[in-house]
Regions:
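Mature catalytic core of soluble alpha/beta enzymes
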Residues: 1-324
Length: 324
């Protein structure tokens, strides 16, 4: 997924849009970008300094969480827990809290999202990136930034507009990559704009909505986040739901003999908060059509699911002309 209201995307900047600036860094095995519009009347050096400072804060938060939760780092807290050197009860409050959130999401998605790998080891990578984005969003708001787009490996959280001075406020457009050809976009989904000042990005904590509840109705105005899971993005935290024994393990793996491939090559979910979007996208890839139907019954979100033959299943928000 790409924010196409972003100067780093080819042909991205919409006509009449304010000049955009972006900074990137690499963390959690992916590229993280922060894009902001230039401030009217502000010297370019001041804009650059403001963006550099904000990016440094975001990068520090991502690095801290990666150092704690990455299973690729042998000395991380998560690795110590997985090796049995540290019990979950002895782990940090944040480790326990995120595990508890992941367990709640497992219950709410009927097991399609899970914090345990098929080999039984705890793996919170399906939750940590969304949590990092949400925390970074809160920090950007605290820094006084009102208009921005934060993209971490295809998971996007926005605030405000790429053209805040435009009448009515233009939305950010999150481009969704075709899993069969990553050079091609299936379409773009509008995020933010109407939601300016309505809600702090990431304000809903992970798993905050009680089971059986739905987000308040009102597509568009509530959509601040969009996440994509599947073959076009990193999928090493996705395991096919409902299997006993070997299962498909991420898009880069053919999986063991007899493993069932997910029904969908890619799933994108737009929601009011990034954790909900990220978890539900992962859950639908893992759980297939049954989980998709359950998600649509329980949450007010927009979903675009891409089958392996290229067929699309889309909710009205993705079928609308503005999302094309």
């Amino acid at each position: 997924m790409q924010p196409i209201s972003d100067p780093t995307s080819a042909g991205a900047e919409p006509a009449g849009a304010t000049s955009l600036r972006a900074r990137t860094f690499v963390c959690m095995g992916t590229v993280v970008s922060l894009t902001v519009p230039a401030q009217p009347g502000s010297p370019s050096d001041a804009d650059a300094d403001r963006l550099e400072a904000a990016t440094a804060v975001v990068e520090d938060q991502f690095e801290d969480l990666d150092a704690r939760f990455s299973l690729f780092k042998p000395n991380s807290e998560a690795s110590r827990v997985s090796r049995g050197e540290l019990s979950l009860m002895e782990a940090s409050p944040l480790m326990r809290d995120l595990y508890a959130d992941a367990v709640r999401w497992r219950r709410r998605t009927d097991g399609a999202f899970t914090p345990e790998r098929p080999d039984g080891l705890m793996d919170l990578s399906g939750l940590v990136k969304g949590y990092a984005i949400a925390e970074a969003g809160r920090s950007l708001v605290a820094l006084g930034l009102h208009d921005w787009c934060l993209n971490a490996g295809g998971d996007v959280l926005v605030s405000g507009s790429p053209a805040p001075s435009a009448a009515g406020g233009k939305p950010w457009l999150a481009g969704i990559v075709d899993p069969a050809d990553r050079r091609t976009l299936l379409g773009a989904y509008p995020l933010g704009a109407q939601a300016v000042g309505a809600q702090a990005p990431g304000a809903l904590p992970p798993g905050a909505l009680p089971p059986g509840s739905r987000e308040p109705a009102g597509s568009g105005a509530r959509r601040l986040a969009l996440a994509t899971s599947g073959s076009a993005e990193r999928g090493d935290h996705i395991w096919t739901a409902g299997l006993r024994g070997p299962s498909w393990r991420g898009p880069s793996s053919q999986g063991p003999a007899g493993a069932r491939r997910p029904e969908f090559a890619q799933v994108s979910v737009a929601a009011s908060d990034i954790v909900t979007a990220d978890v539900l996208a992962t859950a639908v890839v893992a759980g297939g059509r049954g989980t998709l139907d359950a998600v649509m019954a329980r949450w007010d979100v927009d979903v675009l699911a891409v089958a392996h033959d290229g067929a699309l299943l889309a909710t009205p928000g993705f079928r609308a002309p503005s999302a094309a």
